[in-house]
């Protein structure tokens, strides 16, 4: 029961964020589509290119990541809890003539996907919205092929209260971690 309440809440919030055009709901830009591999792999974590690879964008709906992976030559499936985020993926794919499979679902239940289906599972910051991470990782392990890669982003409290400024040898935190005020917008 608790899991369903959390999922319903998350679904409603993300659907509303899309309708309002809020942060983390933007679609890929024309500039990003000029070099989609660079746009999604700016740090060089993905090696060997994406042409012909099977990629799962887990909790990665919204018209940004999945269309860029498809434009870079991957066979893409995107799973997101938000119908509105999935709608954006479908719209951008149609506008750009891209093929992708977009599914509404939770990252902790990928029963609609066969075992050993993907060479790469990519996941933006999203595990913070799930009550039971073991189910998520069990599902990722099940759908990822032997030798495949899992690329996941995570947050910690300092990420939510700081603005890193890049320098040649690292980053400077420009807002105190111990700021007693509300989190920045």
Predicted region positions:
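Hydrophobic residues in well-ordered beta-strands that form the structural core
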Residues: 78, 122, 152-154
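Class I SAM-dependent methyltransferase SAM/SAH-binding core
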Residues: 54-109
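A short SAM/SAH-binding and catalytic strip from SAM-dependent methyltransferases
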Residues: 119-134
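Conserved class I S-adenosyl-L-methionine
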Residues: 1-51, 64-65, 92, 149-184
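A short acidic, Gly/Pro-enriched loop at the edge of an enzyme's catalytic core
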Residues: 111-121
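A short glycine-rich, Lys/Arg-flanked "PGG" loop and its adjoining helix->strand segment in the class I
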Residues: 134-149
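Nucleotide donor/acceptor-binding cores
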Residues: 52-54, 116
